[in-house]
Amino acid sequence: MIRRPPRSTQSRSSAASDVYKRQQIMAWFMDEYGMINGHTPGIVTGKPLELGGSLGRNAATGRGTAIIARETADLLNMDLNGARIVIQGFGNVGSFAGNFLNEMGSKIIAVSNVNGGLIDPDGLDIPSLIEHNEKNKTIKGFSQGKAISNDEILNVECDFLIPAALGGVIHKMNVDKLNCKVIIEAANGPVTPPADDILFKKGIHVVPDILTNAGGVTVSYFEWVQNLQQFQWTEDEVNAKLESKMVAAFKEVGNMMTSKDTSMRMAAFAVAIDRVANSFELRGV
């Protein structure tokens, strides 16, 4: 007997926004699917608010990154207040993460985007830089800081390095030049496996992407739930639920890391596999 896979519906699956797939594209996606299948706003997330999007979704990945950085500092007995932070990638994720970390008292000493970067050892004025970037679509021409390239920014001495752009930027050819204590993976796969092994041996703590940037997909889930309920939560409710989820996930991964004496990446994988294995066992599969 041939078993046909079920047709994709908003009760079974939901697409989320990512790099180059912003609100307008998600709105088109929802509209096209809806013309064929009827009103199904939950089929995609990251939509405009007017079309069933969630409050807090735009900032979610950056907010989650800042929460994870804060929890990591606590775990490693580091002081986030005054900590020197470098952010490669000052788009949606990096700019929000930088703003939240700035509000937490951290010193953002260098940032970059596709056009290059800026560095100021005394700390950049992040709110003004965000305003400049939104107005000019570039961080070039900002009144503060010295120009620095995307490659050079990875080598800046700092406490926390946050790669928030594209994958594979830290690899075996440049990993020995890094001068940070902790790497917070806000992008997807910014550290290659060979580089990851080297960092672990050198004692540089890497917080994996599947934990760090989970804030975005978490609030996408919240958006999907709101669509199914046909009820919108307040931004404070969304942010509080996100905080709770991120902190709980970090603690679970941290406990696994400590108990197994392994890297945080391996601990995150172990937690995920344990959950799947337990669900299969309970179902008798």
What is the role of each PLM region?
Residues S14-S17, G38-V44, I87, A110-N113, ...:
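General beta-strand structural signal in soluble alpha/beta enzymes
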Residues S14-N81:
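Glycine/serine-rich phosphate-binding loop and adjoining beta1-alpha1 elements at the start
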Residues G116-V206, L211:
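Rossmann-like adenosine-cofactor binding region
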Residues K21-R22, N113-L118, T212-G215, I273-R275:
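Glycine-rich beta-alpha junction loops
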Residues G53-A59, R63-L154:
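Glycine-rich phosphate/diphosphate-binding loop of Rossmann-like nucleotide-binding domains
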Residues M1-A16, Y20:
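Single conserved hydrophobic/aromatic residue that forms the stacking wall/gate
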Residues T72, K177-V285:
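Adenosine-phosphate binding glycine-rich loop
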Residues S14-S17, T40, N77-R84, M257-F269, ...:
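Flexible, glycine/charged-enriched surface loops at secondary-structure junctions
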